[in-house]
Amino acid sequence: MKEKLVAIVGPTAVGKTKTSVMLAKRLNGEVISGDSMQVYRGMDIGTAKITAEEMDGVPHHLIDIKDPSESFSVADFQDLATPLITEIHERGRLPFLVGGTGLYVNAVIHQFNLGDIRADEDYRHELEAFVNSYGVQALHDKLSKIDPKAAAAIHPNNYRRVIRALEIIKLTGKTVTEQARHEEETPSPYNLVMIGLTMERDVLYDRINRRVDQMVEEGLIDEAKKLYDRGIRDCQSVQAIGYKEMYDYLDGNVTLEEAIDTLKRNSRRYAKRQLTWFRNKANVTWFDMTDVDFDKKIMEIHNFIAGKLEEKSK
């Protein structure tokens, strides 16, 4: 019998964390974080990492497992998340895969084989030189022309993922989107229920802006400065939204006000890309979280998940 898996996806600031905890408590679940940046220790504020209090007793996995100086790929995530799903089942509990990093979530749900494609070091160095000469946006534009859907799922700051996508295209002759489409045509190895959370754009964007202000109040600048003072600069971790903008401020390239405004704009754009990515996935059932009675909405989603899992287990 297939192992059960609930995936909860959606844009930043839509409420995935709170929703997943409430559902996991009702369904005897454990949460596997599907966020590519919450794996890093010491990057709590900028990644909106869940606190111990917010976990409310629900076990969470794949958070704080890497130093910011280390890399972490979709293949690494798949290697860690896949056995965790089995382990959670063996404890008699229901695994929840929760996050906004679309490629990471899909790689587990459909067991992508992208990690098996070898590296092309010469081409990688060539692209790194291109970034040094022309910048991350120019590299992202290069991917956008070839594979716009993959580009939509990757922020330009995360140039290492952009390089990997271009590397895969060169090595296989297929875009990441084509590779993923082929994998997605194969049924998931899991008894899967996939939930998407959405919200009216104006409401979501207002939540994002307020979240950024809250991050700054809670110490985002000091958090970024600790990484900055460690000399962590070209690493994958600090290409994340929130840290790249603060580094520009710490370098003296922009004022703090400009950095905060850029962070808000980049976060809104990222949310738009996340929605584009997930809305192209046919197996997602969407729930609108705009101005809802939260407890009633949780019960609605709970009943949907329970019904789907029962239906699929027959």
UniProtKB/Swiss-Prot annotation:
ATP binds at residues 10-17. Keywords: ATP-binding, Magnesium, Nucleotide-binding, Transferase, tRNA processing. Its cofactor is Mg(2+). The record marks 101, 124 as: Interaction with substrate tRNA. It catalyses: adenosine(37) in tRNA + dimethylallyl diphosphate = N(6)-dimethylallyladenosine(37) in tRNA + diphosphate. Residues 35-38, 160-164, 239-244, 272-279 are annotated as: Interaction with substrate tRNA. Substrate binds at residues 12-17. One of its GO terms (biological process) is tRNA modification. Pfam families: IPPT. GO terms for molecular function: ATP binding; tRNA dimethylallyltransferase activity. Its EC number is 2.5.1.75. Belongs to the IPP transferase family. Catalyzes the transfer of a dimethylallyl group onto the adenine at position 37 in tRNAs that read codons beginning with uridine, leading to the formation of N6-(dimethylallyl)adenosine (i(6)A). Monomer. This is tRNA dimethylallyltransferase. It comes from Halalkalibacterium halodurans (strain ATCC BAA-125 / DSM 18197 / FERM 7344 / JCM 9153 / C-125) (Bacillus halodurans). The gene is miaA.
